Amino acid sequence: SYFLAQNGHDVTIIDAMPKLGGMLRYGIPEYRLPKEILQKEIDLIAKMGVKMETNTKVGVDVSFESIKNKYDAVLMTIGAWSSIGLHCKGDDTPGVMGGIDFLEKIAKSKTINLGESVAVVGGGNVAMDACRTAVRMGAKKVYNIYRRTIKEMPADEMEIREAQEEGVRFENLTNPIGIIPGEDGRVSKIELQVMKLGEPDERGRRRPVPVEGQTKVLDVDTVIIAIGQQVDSKLFDGIEKTRKNSLVYDPETYMTATKGVFACGDCGNDKVSIAVESIADARKAADSI
């Protein structure tokens, strides 16, 4: 919106959330990105004349077809908000939640009872954000569960180091195989398969393989799954999608196969980006429009 407004376009943001900012507001914890700084950026965009429609969900409050008909160009920046599940026994037990869902609830100041012991599954930055947020919420034990070693973790080294300094317990070379409820029906334990590194995969990373007969169990009150996100694109009919349900767009022009509909950031071409990369994408897409 900022770059399009700079180029002299009339711009309208349509957002399902009550406040603007997307993943910057609801997916990045306060300690990493203070909301006061984000709000100043949004206020600047508003002063540039950008119209802002919040609490407006496509497919519920407005149809995608009507948006396409109303505007000369539509830029899809919907991100990847749907957490990927574990697909193991007990993964639907009360007390199991997605990493982005957890961070979003915290950003919206919703009450969450984590209990004293939390397991966070995953090795990326969202997993580190969830671990460090759980520590800040008062959890006495926070475990990070990752199926490879700490050297293979995709999270930034600084995030891993600071999580260690804050007391997060790293259970590397383990993979969840079951979540066990207690008498109250909520999460009570997580069962882990001990892993070892095998031969490299197609990307050169050594594959984690189970060590036969070796498992371990941790007592936990909450399990947070942060092994990746998917794009919720089912409401956008007529736009070509990848096998993973991400939007397909031309990497040079950022336009989809639907004329006048563009996409960028994590919602397209199965990309996984950090914030600054998505912003760079947005600048290129705005120039193309």
How would you name each of these model-derived features?
Residues 1-12, 24:
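Extended interfacial segments that mediate partner engagement and assembly in macromolecular machines
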Residues 39-88, 178-191, 196-199, 222, ...:
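Feature captures the FAD/FMN-dependent oxidoreductase FAD-binding
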Residues 19, 124-126, 230, 268-269:
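Residue-level detector of alpha-helix initiation sites
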Residues 7, 40-60, 83-137, 242-257:
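Glycine-rich dinucleotide-binding loop and its adjacent helix/turn
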Residues 267-289:
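A conserved FAD-binding loop/helix module that cradles the flavin
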Residues 92-115, 200-272:
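FAD-site-proximal beta/loop scaffold in flavoenzymes
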Residues 76-77, 98, 120, 225:
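Redox-cofactor binding/interface segments in oxidoreductases and associated redox assembly factors
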Residues 13, 17-48, 52, 104-106, ...:
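Rossmann-like dinucleotide-binding cores of NAD(P)H-dependent redox enzymes
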